[in-house]
UniProtKB/Swiss-Prot annotation:
Expression (tissue specificity): Expressed in plasmacytoid dendritic cells (PDC), monocyte-derived dendritic cells (MDDC), granulocytes, monocytes, B-lymphocytes, peripheral blood leukocytes, spleen, bone marrow, and, to a lesser extent, lymph nodes, fetal liver, and appendix but not in thymus.
Topology term for the membrane: Single-pass type I membrane protein
InterPro entries: LRR_dom_sf, LRRC25
Residues modified to Phosphotyrosine: Y284
Bilayer-spanning residue ranges: 166-186
SUPFAM superfamilies: L domain-like (SSF52058)
Protein name: Leucine-rich repeat-containing protein 25
Known partners and oligomeric status: Interacts with RIGI. Interacts with SQSTM1. Interacts with p65/RELA; this interaction promotes the degradation of RELA through autophagy.
Keywords in alphabetical order: Cytoplasm, Glycoprotein, Leucine-rich repeat, Membrane, Phosphoprotein, Repeat, Signal, Transmembrane, Transmembrane helix
Length: 305
């Protein structure tokens, strides 16, 4: 009974003493003044969406544990940690880091707690080359499980092609694809032209001047007579194009005499004329015979020329 009572009295003292071994973390507000000086040994800036300054160092010379988790940081500027000589634990979990400065990795006494990320490859290489007798480096996955950093990098971050090489491969693939598409099209068009040309050459053509079948063309015939000297034509008295014109049936013969010379039967023309009332009326007239122009040339033209 006395032993139980003694343990009951000593347990709170032991717990209080064990808690004093861990540094008490000071939780900062969202509005952090980087010009202020922090005297605490543990600073908690977790989840404040902070942006670390690149041109000045954190004024916390006594800090041992610095928690920067959950701030969306993509890099850790080496200037920010320049005066943190006592820093032993740096927590940058839940930050999408893309680069870790080599000078920070060269601090062999610094324990980095970070997500498993290929950006830690430089940290791993510098530690391996400069820090001997170190424990295996660890990283954390999304379920907060620990993994060996070397094993993670070997499996998930195998050396790949350089950006220029990848670009060249992509361009070459596009060119090959274009040639693969254009090649058959050009070959098909050349084949069609060759077949059409061979068909034209195999057709039996007639004589050079003869008509070519299928084209609907006719040969050109022409004959031109030598220019004839102009012969003076005796002038004849001008006569009207008509002498008599009547509407309806012609009257008696004496009516022709009253108008002038008797009409010649060879020069008579008969025209049916319809008046406004659409009644047919015969029209008689006498026209002087017109001479035909001499046919100086005969020419037969091929259609299309």
């Amino acid at each position: 009974m006395g032993g139980t009572l003694a343990w009951t009295l000593l347990l709170p003292l032991l717990l209080r003493e064990s808690d004093s071994l861990e540094p008490s973390c000071t939780v900062s507000s969202a509005d952090v003044d980087w010009n202020a000086e922090f005297s605490a040994t543990c600073l908690n800036f977790s989840g404040l969406s902070l942006s670390l300054p690149h041109n000045q160092s954190l004024r916390a010379s006594n800090v041992i544990l610095l928690d920067l988790s959950g701030n969306g940081l993509r890099e850790l500027p080496v200037t920010f940690f320049a005066h943190l000589q006592k820093l032993e634990v740096l927590n940058v979990l839940r930050n999408p880091l893309s680069r870790v400065d080599g000078a920070l990795a060269a601090r062999c006494d610094l324990d980095l707690q970070a997500d498993c990320n290929c950006a830690l490859e430089s940290w791993h290489d510098i530690r391996r080359d400069n820090c001997s007798g170190q424990k295996p480096l660890l990283c954390w996955d999304t379920t907060s499980s620990q993994h060996n950093l070397s094993a993670f990098l070997e499996v998930s971050c195998a050396p790949g092609l350089a950006s220029a090489t990848i670009g060249a491969v992509v361009v070459s693939g596009c060119l090959l694809l274009g040639l693969a598409i254009a090649g058959p099209v050009l070959a098909w068009r050349l084949w069609r032209c060759r077949v059409a040309r061979s068909r034209e050459l195999n057709k039996p053509w007639a004589a050079q001047d003869g008509p070519k079948p299928g084209l609907g063309l006719q040969p050109r015939y022409g004959s031109r007579s030598a220019p004839k000297p102009q012969v003076a034509v005796p002038s004849c008295p001008s006569t009207p194009d008509y002498e008599n014109m009547f509407v309806g049936q012609p009257a008696a013969e004496h009516q022709w005499d009253e108008q002038g010379a008797h009409p010649s039967e060879d020069n008579d023309f008969y025209i049916n004329y319809k008046d406004i009332d659409l009644a047919s009326q015969p029209v008689y007239c006498n026209l002087q015979s017109l001479g035909q122009a001499p046919m100086d040339e005969e020419e037969y033209v091929i259609p299309g020329h």
